[in-house]
Amino acid sequence: MYPDNRRYSREHEWVLIESDGRALVGITDYAQEQLGDVVFVELPEAGTQLDQSQKMGEVESVKAVSDLFTPLTGEVAEVNQALVDHPELINDDPHDKGWMVRLASVDATQLDSLLSASEYESFLAELG
């Protein structure tokens, strides 16, 4: 169910390390299901330096406002501007078109603290 080429946080963010070493970050399908229809996303500006587990923004849905946390230390190289006008992309395609930020200068050693797809699925099963 969850792509094997990513790592996952217990806060329900995913990370995809791209061929150039940058990291694409978004929220998982589980997270978007729990949120319901996403109506607004607040993300950091390009150039912002983030530390692992630091709050990087908020996602607002019809149910709640939830904080977003960065799963890796890095610098925001790019923000998915499509989410400004179309936040529903997070619901429609959370693991692809609904990506949130692209990080550069990431600390790849922190990947070991994140979950594989199968570990994340087991984590979700424990949540009930």
Q: Where are these predicted regions, by residue range?
A:
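Histidine- and aromatic-rich ligand-binding microenvironments
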Residues: 67-71, 104
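Acidic, low-complexity mobile loops and tails
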Residues: 1-55, 93-128
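Short, conserved catalytic or interaction motifs in soluble domains
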Residues: 61, 81
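Periplasm/extracytoplasmic soluble domains of Gram-negative envelope assemblies
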Residues: 21, 62-64, 72
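A short beta-loop-beta micro-motif enriched in histidine and acidic residues
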Residues: 36-38, 62-65
